[in-house]
Swiss-Prot record:
Listed GO CC annotations: host cell nucleus
Subcellular location: Host nucleus
The EC number(s) this enzyme carries: 2.7.7.-
Single GO biological process annotation from the record: DNA replication
Protein's name in the database: DNA primase
Family, as annotated: Belongs to the herpesviridae DNA primase family.
Length: 874
């Protein structure tokens, strides 16, 4: 006798099916019991005609896994002719037929584990055979079945879960319960659209389980469930292979990209968007549909080849050192032969060794400039009584025979040989003094306090160790003496930049760096600086690049070693890097210098040194150089000087760190590093000719490429929220923020900021600074105290903004701040929190306001006509 044909069927009943199962096993059938077949996994039924059928009845489980979504409850052995009407949904199984064909022995065996579990801790064990034990525990077994299976389900639940049309319902139900496809119902529903283009009849009129079973049994798609299951398996395998291939492609390239965290997220997003955007997804879906998937190579992949070649080429060239400078950096220069911009014309080495300068506080500067404007308004240009005006005056040259406005500050005898003067800042007696210098013996003083070896034919690291400074621990007694230990140079945008002065801060983690590691970093910086300067003009291999390392903090006397390492800095390595621009070249303008620093930052990110030391760097891709020091009114500390603490203590002296590997004798290098003329922004290096070629633009064309491409792939937004608000509500942006948004922001602000920071927002005003930007201003000033930290200098220099982002669904208002302190990211915008206002609320409010206005006008008109006497609402 041939083996029976095994068919699985998902069943449901018109009564409590848990009770009905136990009744059938215990031969106590309910006469009103009916069992319906909802779906099955049988091949075309005419193929099994005349055979014996083993019909396995299953119920949906409550706890699902990809391999077990329904459970076997009963097994029937019956002829195929008896099974066909049930499987087609034509005839339900009655209690008598179920009892006739039921495999009771198998059913009792399937309940044995449940019986043993229920009697595990029972004091009195049930007696008798398996049937007797099941009868004894019948109520508990029924309760267990109800917890394991979905026993009370309706036709509406099946339709809403698996599909409201015939094709989707039939294919998804059979594949989900009987073929073990590891995916969700939603995925199977999407796969049916690739399997067949027809949807079949609607199931909206189906209300009973009997009708639902008849739909499945009579459907033409019931014979294609096995083919659909094979297609789904093949499609999911290919999808997984494609996704893994895309991930490998992205990850393999990502490992070579020195990106910051934000840029790394954008790159991954864009790379995936190239492969999974709408157009690509539709093309790939067409290639992997039922009729096309067999034509694809079995082991090949498709999606990685769909990456935008322009995007891939840009990423390759932009993040490769050899092609970045050549293809993505644009430099514009201009030669000026007649009266070109000139650097400082002062006396950096007076013969008598005396300093000639004017010094004063900010009030003194303002007073002198006001007096200058009052008495000499007709003799020359006027200067505003601010630091910018002071810098303009210091950098202004006058013609011979013309009155010099600097005579307001310095005697005419001093000004005979000088024109453009530097302006310094000096910290003395807890005050800031502004100093305009005409003659300065700073270099002579350095020769006295810095001891250099007579033999400079030493390796760079040995020469660095051989240098020694005479230490100074406290502020000096007079301002003239203090200028030798505390001095900052102000950047003057009116003058050309002849020496590139870089402020390098590298945040580190873990143990301090060794001397060799620091020297490797300096060599890398030197190499990239020279590489970039060659875009401006010719640069020799022995071009000087001076490094000044911030001195280490004092060692802990309790844990001091016998021999201290060269550096014990933790948290940050600070350097001042200074190099003259190519001979005859200079940079003019703040934007050009900042562009140079930005390109240098990108070059440093492409170096192997930083990637090799990434385990000792806090954040790869974080800015190394501070580009904010190249604005009017910003100053930077000079090499060899100290940082002045509160109370007058001196610390963190910037000391020379020798990095000049191209020359064996470094005597001239060390000598020039001690000359103030070589250390200032606008001073000409010793031995350099006056500049004739001026660079006025340096830009990285691909700097915002990732941001722009990300914006292009995001859903479109309304650029002008102000116009939208005014169009719907008739309110300007400031009035809308003040009346509708600020109360909600205040309730969130009370929990988002420290308690002592909240009162400053009780009285504020608003100022629109852009179409989507509103600045929050303090009632007694524009700015606020820092919301994140309590800084040493507790001045209120934090700007607060509300940034509005509008989509068709909602307006998102983000509360942001900018703090100037380095601890807060040096003026980097910080988002604190956001609230969302549904767009429907704005539209509804506008419509309500319009209806109210219309109603009031109508009532007013009616009352004037005399036809109505009701009054207007308040």
């Amino acid at each position: 006798m041939s083996a029976p044909v095994v068919i699985k069927a998902l069943v449901a009943s018109n009564t409590d099916i848990a009770e009905a199962i136990l009744d059938a096993i215990l031969s106590r059938p309910d006469e009103g019991f009916r069992l319906f077949c909802l779906c099955h996994n049988a091949s075309p039924l005419h193929h099994v005609a005349g055979s014996l059928v083993e019909l396995q009845l299953h119920l949906p489980k409550k706890r699902l896994t990809s391999q077990s979504r329904c459970g076997l409850v009963l097994t029937l052995h019956l002829p195929a002719e008896e099974a066909f009407p049930f499987l087609r949904g034509l005839t339900p199984l009655t209690a008598d037929r179920l009892s006739t064909y039921l495999d009771r022995a198998g059913a009792l065996r399937s309940l044995t584990p449940l019986v043993e579990l229920l009697t595990l801790s029972a004091k009195k064990q049930p007696q008798g055979d398996a049937r007797g034990r099941v009868a004894w525990l019948r109520p508990k077994i029924v309760g267990c079945l109800r917890r394991i299976y979905r026993v009370n389900i309706s036709a509406r639940w099946f339709i809403s879960t698996f599909g409201s049309h015939e094709a989707q319902f039939v294919l998804v139900t059979a594949a989900y319960y009987f073929w073990g496809i590891p995916c969700t119902i939603e995925t199977l529903a999407h796969l049916t659209e690739l399997f067949t283009s027809e949807s079949g009849q609607s199931l909206a009129a189906v209300t009973s389980l009997a009708e639902l079973g008849e739909v499945f049994g009579s459907s033409a798609w019931a014979e294609q469930t096995e083919a659909f299951a094979h297609f789904a398996h093949e499609k999911l395998r290919r999808d997984s292979r494609e996704i893994r291939a895309v991930a490998r492609t992205i990850d393999a390239y990502r490992g070579r990209l020195p990106l910051a965290s934000a840029d790394l997220v954008r790159y991954v997003y864009l790379a995936h968007a190239q492969c999974f955007n709408e157009g690509t997804f539709k093309r790939y879906s067409q290639l992997t549909s039922m009729g096309e998937i067999g034509c694809l190579p079995s082991g090949g992949v498709v999606l990685p080849s769909l990456l935008d070649r322009g995007f891939a080429e840009h990423m390759r060239t932009y993040f490769t050192r050899e092609t970045y400078l050549a293809e993505h950096v644009r430099v514009q220069q201009l030669k000026i032969r007649m009266e070109p911009p000139a650097p400082y014309t002062w006396d950096p080495d007076p013969d008598d060794g005396l300093m000639r300068a004017w010094a004063g506080l900010s009030v003194d500067v303002a007073r002198e400039l006001v007096e200058l404007a009052r008495w000499h308004a007709d003799e020359g240009p006027t200067y505003p009584p601010t630091l910018q005006g002071f810098l303009c005056l210091a950098g202004q040259a006058t013609c011979r025979g013309q009155w010099n406005p600097k005579e307001q500050f310095l005697p005419p005898t001093v000004l005979r040989r000088v024109q453009r003067l530097p302006v310094f800042l000096c910290h003395f007696a807890d005050r800031h003094y502004f100093v305009m210098t005409a003659a300065d013996p700073f270099s002579s003083h350095l020769a006295e306090v810095v001891s250099t070896p007579t033999n400079c034919r030493l390796p760079d690291t040995c020469l660095t160790r051989a240098l020694s400074y005479t230490p100074v621990y406290y502020s000096q007694n007079s301002l003239s003496e203090q200028l030798f230990v505390s001095r900052h140079e102000y950047f003057n945008p009116r003058l050309p930049v002849c020496n590139l002065v870089l402020d390098l801060d590298l945040k580190i983690k873990g143990a301090p760096w060794s001397l060799e590691e620091i020297y490797d970093l300096c060599r890398t910086v030197r190499r990239e600086v020279l590489r970039l300067m060659r875009r401006l003009g010719p640069v020799s291999r022995a071009h000087p690049v001076y490094f000044f390392k911030s001195a280490c903090p004092p060692a802990d006397p309790d844990n001091m070693e016998d021999v201290l390492p060269f550096c014990i800095c933790t948290g940050k390595l600070g350097f001042r890097v200074i190099t003259p621009l190519p001979r005859g070249h200079a940079i003019v303008g703040t934007s050009a210098v900042q562009g140079f620093v930005s390109v240098l930052q990108k070059l440093m990110g492409l170096t192997a040194c930083l990637r090799r030391m990434r385990h000792k760097i806090k954040e790869i891709g974080a800015p190394l150089f501070d580009s904010g020091v190249y604005h009017a009114g910003r100053c930077i500390r000079l090499p060899h000087t100290y940082k002045v603490d509160r109370g007058g203590g001196l610390s963190r002296q910037l000391r020379l760190f020798v990095c000049h590997p191209e020359e064996e004798d470094k005597h001239s290098y060390v000598k020039n590093a001690l000359n103030i003329q070589n250390l200032l922004h606008h001073s000409l290096h010793v031995g350099w000719p006056a500049p004739k070629t001026f660079c006025y633009h340096i830009a990285d064309d691909g700097r915002d490429y990732l941001i722009q491409r990300t914006r292009e792939t995001l859903p479109p937004t309304v650029e002008n929220v102000c116009a939208m608000i005014e169009g719907h509500l008739g309110l300007d942006l400031v009035a809308w923020v003040s009346s509708c948004i600020w109360p909600s922001l205040m309730s969130t602000l009370a929990t988002a900021v420290p308690e002592d920071k909240f009162p400053q927002f009780l009285h504020v005003t608003f100022e629109q600074t852009g179409p989507n930007l509103v600045q929050v201003c303090h009632a007694r000033g524009r700015n606020f105290a820092c919301l994140r930290h309590t800084h040493r200098a507790s001045s209120k220099n934090v700007r607060v903004f509300l940034v509005l982002y509008y989509t068709s669904q909602a307006i998102t208002v983000t509360f942001m701040s900018q703090c100037f302190a380095g601890r807060c990211g040096a003026n980097q915008p910080t988002a604190h929190f956001s609230i969302s206002v549904p767009a429907s609320r704005i539209i509804n409010r506008a419509e309500a306001s319009q209806d109210s206005t219309t109603s009031q006008l109508a009532r007013r008109r009616d009352r004037q006509d005399g036809s109505f006497s009701e009054t207007l609402p308040n």
